[in-house]
């Protein structure tokens, strides 16, 4: 894994499963994450001791779009009947060929897209680097896999009707 090369974390999104082993993509396949948050929780028994399964959880994410056509994959996920993979790579490094060279840490989440909101800015940017389009998605999580430097840890999320 990469050594920390920045005090500011940079996160990118790839809609593939890093834990599958066949993780090949280029820098063009990545989207910049502006922000994301999620909350996982577990229940307590009658004595107040935490235990049991991790309950149903949501993740919200805002992603910068470089082209309007990039929103299609999120709308495809919205109508899909199976969970989609979303891999978040922190401080990724790419080689001169544009292929992934290294990354610091990563997290792959699986889930159903339940809400999509597009945001457009009326500000005109002189340089094309700051695209005025972003998309906000809400994902009902089914599984999370944390990819650390030494190993991966899986958190299965059980949906309950509570």
Regions found by a protein language model. Name each.
Residues 1-162:
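Glycine-rich, low-complexity intrinsically disordered segments
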């Amino acid at each position: 894994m990469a050594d920390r090369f920045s005090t500011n974390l940079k996160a990118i999104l790839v809609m593939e499963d890093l834990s599958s082993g066949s993780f090949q993509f280029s820098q063009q396949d990545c989207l910049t994450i502006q922000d994301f948050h999620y909350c996982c929780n577990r229940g307590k028994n009658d004595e107040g001791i935490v235990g049991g399964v991790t309950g149903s959880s949501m993740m919200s994410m805002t992603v910068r779009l470089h082209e309007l056509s990039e929103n299609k994959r999120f709308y495809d996920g919205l109508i899909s009947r199976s969970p989609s993979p979303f891999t978040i790579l922190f401080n990724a490094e790419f080689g001169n060929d544009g292929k992934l060279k290294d990354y610091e840490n990563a997290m792959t989440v699986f889930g159903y897209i339940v809400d999509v909101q597009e945001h457009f800015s009326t500000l005109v940017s002189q340089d094309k680097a700051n695209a005025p389009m972003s998309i906000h998605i809400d994902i009902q999580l089914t599984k999370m896999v944390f990819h650390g430097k030494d190993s991966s840890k899986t958190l299965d999320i059980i949906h309950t009707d509570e």
